[in-house]
Amino acid sequence: MIQDAFVKDMNEELLSWFMHQVVIRDTIIRRSTDADDHRSLNIRSTAVLSLLIQPPLTIDIADIEWLELCDDIAMLKDIKVFLVNGPHAASAYLGWYRGYTIINELLEDEDGAAFIQEVTKEIRAGILQQYPISEEQLDKLSVFPKAKGDMPDTVYRVGKDPLRKLSYDDRLCGSARMCKAHHLPYEYIVQAIAYGLLYDEKTDEAAMQMQILIQEKGIIVAVHQICGFSYQDDLLKEICSWYVRLKNK
């Protein structure tokens, strides 16, 4: 736990003060932030929805703008990864495949926007079956108001580290598994995963490791190792099939 990292080296007096004065709570961040690299002091960010904070707190934040107490943070974090981050990653990988550098460019492309809409639709259907959440609650969490000035969001930032973003429980593979478990369509999610496996940005170390694995072991072994699906799983077979089709297109 995060709290353990804080308190492990405290003496008795400091620990007593800490336990009475400090609370550590989970949050859900709903905003886009970009920078040239992880050391950059020039950070571009936009916020259109409040920071969701796990209760209880020791202070009243009712009058503080952009902060909002919210129950069921753990469940909502899982949902947010699937429903917000899933289509976002799909946008990056499809955008890369089509030669875009900015996510916004893909979403202005009629076909691209339609594809992401279908990915979102599949994930949303799975979530409504998997979790005790209403359509209204889902909209409140995931439908972002339009910002006054759109911040260009790079394909590089959103697609970075495909080894993590294509892993078993993460945004796309986790969504596909969820839909499959409830006997719901997942065709567009599977295609998005295949686009992700084609992501070969040269400056992305994880992307290069992924491409080396595919080249050396083949796509079937690579999907098994990266996405975590068994060799008998229909998801593995469908992802590999789409990968070959898209690669040869």
Task: List the predicted regions and their residue ranges.
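Substrate/ligand-engaging "lid" and interaction regions
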Residues: 1-249
